[in-house]
């Protein structure tokens, strides 16, 4: 996949809150992010992210329809 394909297929989203760690060993972070463009602009969704992130970072999402399950599990 080239950089041009990635740019046209993805949607940017800004991290507004870090909810907590998730995954079997705490390797992923669950974050709330606001969609910045496209048909879902302004919508806030929950996603699981690998790697170091902090509030204000911008993610490139391939899909904006799915939300991550909540961490609580109860």
From Swiss-Prot:
Keyword Ribosomal protein assigned to the entry: answer is yes
* Origin superkingdom: Archaea
- Which GO terms of the cellular component aspect does the record hold? cytosolic small ribosomal subunit
- InterPro entries on file: NA-bd_OB-fold (IPR012340), Ribosomal_eS28 (IPR000289)
Enumerate the UniProt keywords alphabetically.
Ribonucleoprotein, Ribosomal protein
Q: Which GO terms describe its molecular function?
A: structural constituent of ribosome
Query: Can you supply a Gene Ontology BP term from the record?
Result: translation
Q: Provide the transmembrane region boundaries.
A: none
The keyword Ribosomal protein is assigned to this record: yes
Q: Name one Pfam family in it.
A: Ribosomal_S28e
**Family note:** Belongs to the eukaryotic ribosomal protein eS28 family.
The name of this protein is Small ribosomal subunit protein eS28
> Could you tell me which species this protein originates from?
Haloquadratum walsbyi (strain DSM 16790 / HBSQ001)
């Amino acid at each position: 996949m080239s950089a041009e394909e990635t740019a046209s297929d993805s949607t940017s989203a800004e991290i507004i809150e870090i909810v907590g760690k998730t995954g079997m060993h705490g390797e992923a972070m669950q974050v709330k992010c606001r969609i910045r463009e496209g048909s879902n602009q302004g919508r806030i969704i929950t996603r699981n992210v690998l790697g170091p992130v902090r509030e204000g970072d911008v993610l490139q999402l391939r899909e904006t329809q799915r939300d991550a399950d909540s961490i609580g599990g109860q």
